[in-house]
Design a protein with these regions (language model features):
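The beta1-alpha1 cofactor-binding region of Rossmann-like NAD(H)/NADP(H)-dependent oxidoreductases
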Residues: 42-43, 60-72, 104, 217
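Alpha-helical segment proximal to the catalytic Tyr-Lys
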Residues: 127, 171-175, 232
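Active-site helix of classical SDR
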Residues: 122, 158, 166
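Residue(s) in the substrate-gating loop at a strand-loop-helix junction
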Residues: 142
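Catalytic Tyr-X3-Lys loop
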Residues: 84, 100-119, 134, 138, ...
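C-terminal substrate-recognition "lid" of short-chain dehydrogenase/reductases
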Residues: 119, 134, 178, 212-241, ...
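Substrate-binding pocket helix/loop in short-chain dehydrogenase/reductase
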Residues: 97-99, 103-111, 193, 200, ...
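Short C-terminal tail/terminal secondary-structure segment
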Residues: 1-5, 93-96, 147, 224, ...
Length: 248
């Protein structure tokens, strides 16, 4: 593992109790950052904290509640100091269904978590980063946001919007020492697969030229550099993690 110095940094990782979020948290912790995990699942948070070590902070928070996000940030900074790194990993896939049959309630839920939640967290952490003239933000989108997956319109739309949000915010903050980027992973071996049909999972796998799914540690390796001081120029950009599937 390449060593990236994140000493003195305080990172918030949403969706940090499992999957890519947990892998990112472990990598940032190993690189010297203090880490606070945000997740809705209190039980999984405790397991993740035990895996990372006693110094890891946790906050049970619903990122679809803008006020709850602000309060969680206050508690996080009171316990661990100013947040200089934010990785938005919380998200859901939603059901597989054609658009004309897609449940409106599910549509709203997917958009609320994947897009609105990412907006609320970014909106909360940005003022402090601007005041300190430093910050690193990575929003986790998806290859589906670039190419669209059939029978996954809500997920594809939400992740495309995260890419747009990232590009807009990165340009807004370009005059500060704040980098805002996103990554677009192909399918990874995480619990999000439990929300999908076997047929849809195979549809995604065969479209990856590497011939396999993304490993969560591979995503964490890229993100660790993006949130480091070494990433001093690149912002408002999208980094591909699709194993060759992306066409642009």
């Amino acid at each position: 593992m390449n060593q990236i110095d994140l000493g003195g940094q305080h990172a918030v990782v949403t969706g940090g109790a499992q999957g890519i979020g947990l892998a990112v948290a472990k990598r940032l912790h190993a690189s010297g950052a203090s880490v606070t995990l945000w997740d809705l699942d209190a039980g999984e948070l405790e397991k993740a904290k035990a895996a990372l070590g006693g110094s890891t902070g946790t906050q049970t928070v619903d990122i679809t509640d803008a006020e709850a996000v602000v309060e969680a940030l206050k508690r996080t900074e009171a316990a661990g100091g100013p947040v200089s790194i934010c990785v938005n990993s919380a998200g859901i896939a939603g059901p597989n269904a054609t658009l004309d049959a897609y449940d409106v309630g599910w549509w709203r839920k997917v958009i609320d978590i994947n897009l609105n939640g990412t907006f609320y967290v970014n909106r909360a952490v940005v003022p402090g980063m601007k005041a300190r003239n430093y910050g690193r933000i990575v929003n986790i989108a998806s290859i589906a946001g670039k190419e669209g997956n059939p029978n996954a319109s809500a997920y594809s739309a939400s992740k495309a919007a995260v890419i747009g949000l990232t590009k807009s915010l990165g340009k807004e903050l370009a005059g500060y020492d704040i980098a805002v980027n996103c990554v677009t992973p192909a399918t990874a071996q995480t619990r999000i697969l439990e929300q999908l049909t076997p047929e849809f999972i195979e549809y995604m796998r065969v479209r990856i030229p590497r011939g396999r799914f993304l490993e969560v540690d591979e995503a964490a390796a890229m993100i660790a550099w993006l949130v480091s001081k070494e990433n001093s120029f690149t912002t408002a950009s999208t980094f591909d993690l699709s194993g060759g599937r992306a066409t642009y």
